Amino acid sequence: YSVDTGRNVYLQPSLASQGVKGTVTNALASAFVGSLGGGKSFCNNLLVYYSVLFGGQAVILDPKSERGNWKETLPEIAHEINIVNLTSDKDNAGLLDPFVIMKDKEDGATLAKEILTFLTGISTRDGDKFPVLISAISNVSESEHRGLLNVITELRKENTPIANHIANHIASFTNYDFAHLLFSDGTVKNTISLDNQLNIIQVADLVLPDKDTTFNEYTTIELLSVSMLIVISTFALDFIHSDRSIFKIVDLDEAWAFLNVAQGETLSNKLVRAGRAMQAGVYFVTQSAYDVSKESLKNNIGLKFAFRSTDINEIKQTLEFFGIDKDDENNQKRLRDLENGQCLLQDLYGRVGVVQIHPVFEELLHAFDTRPPVQRNEVE
């Protein structure tokens, strides 16, 4: 409800694409920004839950594995919840291999190129290494068994100093148990299904880089983790291109982790554009408005939710993201003084106001509570 008027605020997330008179955007994408503990995840979860309840379909990328108990805490829709927990267990080997996860052969090869250039740092401008890598990926793409491990084999067949160097570089990533999700020999029979109404994808042992870490400082495990997020998000494109008559949501929690790298930024724009055509909203959940403020993305975001922030630079960035005066002290104070569960909301008509997110049902409050148990008990 509106904090200023006390009146209920009604949201229909799929409305943007229907060209309703008076709306200032036809973008289905949404952004949820704000520092930890302000209610960002709760609001996001609530919106996804109700969209599913009203007939929509959703895929949630859950890098912190906070939604693993939803089958128990949301028993009334448990039969429609599909939790895909990707551990480094042998049964899951290769499930995130680009050649395995993408239905289309060419899409698989394109994603393999994205992932291997990301991991190795080989740029398209590298006239020595790049053509050798692309040639190996193309050969694997045309073979019977397609998998990233076979790219290493293909490079070694080449047996030139450059090909061997690239092969050794890629092979060094496979020494981590965690990497088995990403690398396969192309004989994997298991696949990830997103046929349920509410699909949650979790990757165990994911280690995301710190928000302020530059790309050059990423550790090997962080590079692998971000690679997996890119693979899963690209896989979500297949989900977006399913039945156009059903409203779909691709929910990207901790979105900053891949918005901060070039491949992730390109992918985000691709998801948003596909979503607009196929009646799917891409939801970016992130701590900073800066992550979603690049012009190419910002102009394609419809609903905006901003939760409390105390950092003045962050406050100004958020106000600018909303298109309101960032230097106005009253605006700054409004954002700084938001209580838990309150947020600044910009709707499809461009109106901005403070709303209180109210779950109505107590069981939803417990289901979507992401606070650690100790803190929760203290509050209760």
Residue positions per predicted region:
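A short beta-strand-to-loop transition that corresponds to the Sensor-1 phosphate-sensing loop
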Residues: 64, 285-289, 309-310
